[in-house]
Structure formats: C-alpha cells, structure tokens
Swiss-Prot record:
NCBIfam families with a match to the protein in the record: trpB
Purpose of the protein: The beta subunit is responsible for the synthesis of L-tryptophan from indole and L-serine.
The protein, known as: Tryptophan synthase beta chain
EC number: 4.2.1.20
Single annotated GO MF: tryptophan synthase activity
InterPro entries: Trp_synth_b_CS, Trp_synth_beta, Trp_synth_beta/beta-like, TrpB-like_PALP, TrpB-like_PALP_sf
Keyword match Amino-acid biosynthesis: yes
Record keywords, A-Z: Amino-acid biosynthesis, Aromatic amino acid biosynthesis, Lyase, Pyridoxal phosphate, Tryptophan biosynthesis
Keyword Cytoplasm attributed: no
Length: 409
C-alpha cells in the first residue's frame, strides 16, 4: 500500500499497515474466514447489490440531504458549513446503513440468529429493526451503565422484539458489551451472525462495515459537486469506533485537496484519566480481534474510557483510523464534554436540529475551525445521529450545572 493510494487497504491478512488483522479464538477462525469469503462473493453479486440498493432507498430513505447550515455559518462567520443528514435515516442515525448490508449477508449465509453489541443504543435499535424486518431472533448486549443512560433506546429495542442482555462486568459500557457478544458468538458459531456496529473487530469487519457506510461519502461527493461544482475543502466527523467517520472519509481519501478531521471524545480533557481519545491518549495494542490504538495503563491493561456520549465511550478505535493517523492523511483531535454540550445547544438554537451528543463533538470542532477560515471554504460535517436518545443526559447535566451555579451564588 503506497501513501498515494490510501483506499487500497486492507491487505489479504486484513491489515492496514500494521493495524487490523484477525486476533480471534481458534474456534472462531473458520467462521471469520468463511465470513470473508461470503462477503467477497456478495460484493461481486449483482443481485446482492440490487437488493441492498432497494432497502437503502425504500426502507432507510436514502439518499439523505446535504444541507447548507446557513445560520450556523453566519454565527461562525467563516467557512460555509454543510451537514450530511444521517440523522434523517430510518432509526435516526448512520447505523442502519451497515445493518442492512450485514443482515442481507446473514440471510445469504443461512444464519438464523443475530447478536450485536451497543453503547448509545443506536446500533442496537438498527440491529433490532433489521431483525424484525427479516424475521430473525435478536440478542443485544448492552452495558448496565449504558442501559441506565439510554432508557429510551432500550425500550425501542424491546418494542422491536430484541432481547436485551445487561452486562455488569468492567464499567458496564461498550467494551464490556462487545466482550460478552464475542463470548456468545464462540458458543453459537453455527447458527449465529454477529452484527458488529463499527469499523473494528477481526477482519473482514473493519473493511465490511466501512464499505457499507461508504454510501455517506459517495452521496456527499455527488451532492457537493451538484451544489457547488467542486469537492469540499474539509470533512469533519466524530470518532468512537469510527464508522460514520470512515463512511464519510473513505471516498475522499485519495482526493489530496480535501482536508479530513476526525474528532475523538476528550471527556474531561486528554490530560486527565477521564476521556475516550484513543489516538490522542493511547498506544497500540490488541482488543476485540484487531490491533489498533487503545487506552492502556503501564502494564498494558485496558483502562476505562469516559465520555458524556455513550456512543464514543470506547477505549479503542477502528484499525483503519489508526493507520490514517500514522500516515497523517487524517488529523485526529479531541473535544471535551463541555465543548460538545455547547455545540449541541448552538445547533438546536441556530438550525432547529437536535443532534446526538456524538455528533456534537464534530460540530464543536467544525465551529472552532470555521471561524478562522475564508467564506469560500466548503466544510461538511457528518450529522451522524439525532439527539432524542440524549435528552435525559442533557437534562441531568443542565440540572447539575444549575445546582452548582446556585451554590456559587
């Protein structure tokens, strides 16, 4: 892989440079290899492609708009800001793009049961949605901490027929849910399809999820050429595991004129131990079947991640992001909880759009940058999801802030 072609990975072993690979139990290796064969065959099958296009159009509601955020642009006083409106998809986020692709693959492989992990609940909702549509039983592993802060999505999953398994090990968040889902998969390899929600896990998952999400960037490229007659100057997206970001970024990686920025969750600050910024505060290691950047202590043990956003509260990042960081094609920065909350409120007041707290991290970075850019600079922000699920978190934070203010007075 040369640095003039950033889109050619992974190699036959699932590696992006030194990142990725297949670090799985011996019992899972035949299944992972079989999944890779089936995926490669499906990609080349016109019927599979046709069926996926049908569901993307008539079920998900694609293409979604590329929207000029006029009032936010005026407020920042610099770059012209566009939103790629993934929150308008069926289920309210980008997650459904990947779930449609994987459930069609599961059906093609004759699998009878779906399992998934979820943090913010949006991947769980999207998985439960496709399971209902295709008549498959579905088990969702979700950390007990995340269940408490995402009650609305838990109820949605149950309405859709999914069984929710609370995970109390560790910190009860996304990392722990993924551990339990992998244990289930090892036990039920013959009839179960593990529908991973981000660009992580053993090969072929990082590449497969990226490919299913790349419709975001493909549409953005077409829509920007139609609206402005040229490519955007910059792209901004939040990064937890990193599937919405990779979906937006990948079609543009070989367009050298396009600056690409991934935004990690800075929590209370990367200099503290309360953040989820794996690239800005981590080191390479192996977790959940792939080698990538991870939050680790001096003994190589995975440390707890923190973010106000459940969907970014993960101590790792997709291996392709790790590669793009090392070769410096993408710039990765971090935004704190407080900065994300400020951007959340500004987006609500200026654009009448309530974004997910994950998305608010990207908005905060976009607003910082836009102010210092020319008014002919075209910036695209991936509006990865809507904020309905985050109402309780925001309410709690506002109540706590008011209480603190009262004490100061």
């Amino acid at each position: 892989m040369t640095q003039t072609n950033f889109r050619s990975g992974p190699d036959a072993n699932g590696l992006f440079g030194s990142f990725g690979g297949r670090y799985v139990a011996e019992t899972l290796m035949p299944l992972v290899l079989d999944l890779n064969r089936e995926y490669e065959a499906a990609k080349a099958d016109p019927e599979f492609i046709k069926e996926m296009a049908y569901f993307q159009r008539d079920y998900v509601g694609r293409p979604n708009p590329l929207y000029f955020a006029e009032r936010l642009t005026e407020f920042c006083g610099g770059a012209k800001i566009y939103f790629k409106r993934e929150e308008l998809n069926h289920t309210g986020a980008h997650k459904i793009n990947n779930c449609i692709g994987q459930v069609l693959l599961a059906k093609r492989m004759g699998k009878k049961r779906l399992i998934a992990e979820t943090g913010a609940g949006m991947h769980g909702v999207a998985t439960a949605t496709v399971a209902a549509r295709f008549g498959l039983p579905c088990v969702i592993y979700m950390g007990a901490t995340d269940i408490e802060r995402q009650q609305a999505n838990v109820f949605r999953m149950r309405l859709l027929g999914a069984e929710i398994v609370p995970v109390t090990s560790g910190t009860g968040t996304l990392k722990d849910a993924m551990n339990e889902a992998l244990r289930d998969w090892v036990t039920n390899v013959d009839d179960t399809f593990y529908l991973i929600g981000t660009v992580a896990g053993p090969h072929p998952y990082p590449a497969m999820v990226r490919d299913f999400q790349a419709i975001i960037g493909k549409e953005t490229k077409e829509q920007m050429l139609e609206k402005e007659g040229r490519l955007p100057d910059s792209l901004v997206a939040c990064v937890g595991g990193g599937s919405n970001a990779m979906g937006l970024f990948h079609p543009f990686l070989d367009d050298a004129s396009v600056e690409i920025i991934g935004v990690e969750a800075g929590g209370h600050g990367v200099s503290t131990d309360k953040h989820a910024a794996s690239l800005n505060g981590g080191v390479p290691g192996v977790l959940h079947g792939n080698r990538t950047y991870l939050l680790q202590d001096g003994d190589g043990q995975i440390t707890d991640a923190h973010s106000i956003s459940a969907g970014l509260d993960y101590p790792g990042i997709g291996p392709e992001h790790a590669f793009l960081h090392e070769v410096k094609r993408v710039e990765y920065v971090s935004i704190t909880d407080d900065e994300a909350l400020d951007a959340f409120h500004q987006c609500c007041l200026l654009e009448g759009i309530i974004p997910a707290l994950e998305t608010a991290h990207a908005l905060a970075e976009a607003m910082k940058r836009a102010t210092n850019l020319r008014d002919d600079h075209l910036m695209v922000v991936c509006l990865s999801g809507r904020g309905d699920k985050d109402m309780q978190t925001v309410m709690n934070h506002m109540a706590a802030a008011e209480h603190t203010q009262e004490q100061l007075v």
